[in-house]
């Protein structure tokens, strides 16, 4: 039996792949499965536009991850019978003033230098693609290969597949792992808020809550929560405002097939605080309105916060622990 701590997209995907090769897994989650960062996520697959100076070593991994998504989505949809809304319309990063335009030119040069294929667009070319974009938008970078997926649909599809395999996958929700018990660097059990579970193999997918587990490492794992506030607006189905993902100053607009429009996300170092704030919502709507003014007429149908698991260098932490 392999124990997986955390039932978000990563934990559930690992469970699915282990089941496929005949392994038995037990998934523990402190809440309901998939109700934290994966539920909050907008589903942007922006491994190209998110490439930054100083992170060049990550580029091959980002590219490999993006290339894996079409096959992953296709297989998951076929097996689960559920749609995950993998969309290939692309993403446009926008500049609305002189300073932003200069910064965007620098970003475009960086992409070109690192052979990340993008297309430079002037304001008129952007408005051909997206007629409702503000006339104040001066320029943009179009990334055809930065796609999106509906993260909540992905969760639903993964849960459907996993729950069909009741003989191989066991789930315990509202079960928080408090401590890992080991002997001579070998895991022997985990202590939860309910009981002690004997186990020899653990896969930790606890995200922002990783460091709340005692004895997970002799040193603090460099993961911290970063809060993001988000809003969902409803577009007119007969006149949807945008087709592509739009992105400016770290704020993005993500259109869904059901005409929802996701506006996100703040980036706040607030520990485990998940409050929605007037300032956070105002910031999102202000930037969004500057990109697409007609947004001000759309009804707000939902809002939420999520806690991203974040590292100092933005790199994922993958691999075996030398302490356990």
Describe each region flagged by the PLM:
Residues 29, 122-123, 173-175, 302-304:
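Short loop/edge segments at beta-strand edges and connector loops
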Residues 10, 33, 209:
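Conserved Rossmann-like nucleotide-cofactor binding loop
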Residues 82-95, 107-108, 114-165, 266-271:
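Helix-loop-beta segment of a Rossmann-like dinucleotide-binding subdomain
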Residues 99, 130-137, 181-188, 310-314, ...:
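A short, glycine/Asx- and small/polar-enriched loop/turn
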Residues 140-201, 205:
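Helical element adjacent to the flavin cofactor pocket in flavoenzyme catalytic cores
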Residues 1-27:
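N-terminal Rossmann-like FAD-binding beta1-loop-alpha1 element of flavoenzymes
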Residues 16-21, 28-30, 43-44, 49, ...:
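Active-site substrate-recognition segment that forms the wall
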Residues 44-125, 129, 288:
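Dinucleotide-binding Rossmann-like beta1-alpha1 core, especially the glycine-rich loop
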């Amino acid at each position: 039996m392999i124990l997986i701590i955390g039932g978000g997209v990563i934990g559930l995907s690992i469970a699915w792949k282990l089941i496929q090769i005949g392994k038995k897994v037990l998934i523990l989650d402190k809440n309901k499965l998939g109700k934290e960062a994966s539920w909050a996520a907008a589903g942007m697959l922006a491994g190209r536009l998110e490439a930054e100076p100083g992170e060049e070593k990550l580029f091959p991994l980002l590219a490999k991850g993006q290339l894996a998504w079409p096959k992953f989505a296709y297989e998951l949809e076929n097996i689960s019978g559920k749609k995950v809304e993998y969309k290939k319309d692309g993403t446009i990063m926008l500049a609305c003033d002189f300073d932003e335009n200069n910064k965007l030119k620098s970003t475009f040069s960086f992409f070109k230098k690192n052979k990340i294929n993008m297309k430079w667009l002037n304001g008129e070319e952007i408005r051909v693609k997206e007629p409702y974009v503000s006339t104040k938008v001066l320029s943009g970078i179009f990334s055809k290969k930065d796609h999106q997926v509906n993260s909540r649909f992905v969760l639903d599809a993964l849960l459907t597949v996993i729950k069909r395999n009741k003989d191989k996958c066991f789930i315990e929700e509202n079960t928080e792992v408090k401590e890992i018990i080991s002997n001579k660097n070998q895991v022997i059990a985990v202590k939860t808020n309910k009981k002690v579970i004997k186990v020899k193999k653990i896969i930790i997918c606890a995200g922002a809550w990783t460091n709340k587990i005692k004895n997970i490492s002799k040193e603090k794992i460099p993961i911290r929560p970063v809060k993001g506030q988000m809003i969902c607006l409803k577009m007119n189905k007969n006149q949807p405002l945008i087709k592509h993902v739009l992105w400016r100053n770290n704020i993005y607009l993500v259109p869904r097939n059901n005409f929802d429009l996701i506006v996100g996300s703040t980036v706040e170092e607030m520990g485990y605080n998940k409050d929605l704030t007037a300032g956070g919502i105002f910031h999102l709507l202000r930037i969004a309105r500057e990109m697409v003014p007609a947004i001000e007429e759309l009804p707000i149908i939902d809002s939420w916060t999520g806690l991203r698991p974040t590292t100092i260098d933005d790199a994922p932490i993958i691999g075996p622990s030398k302490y356990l």
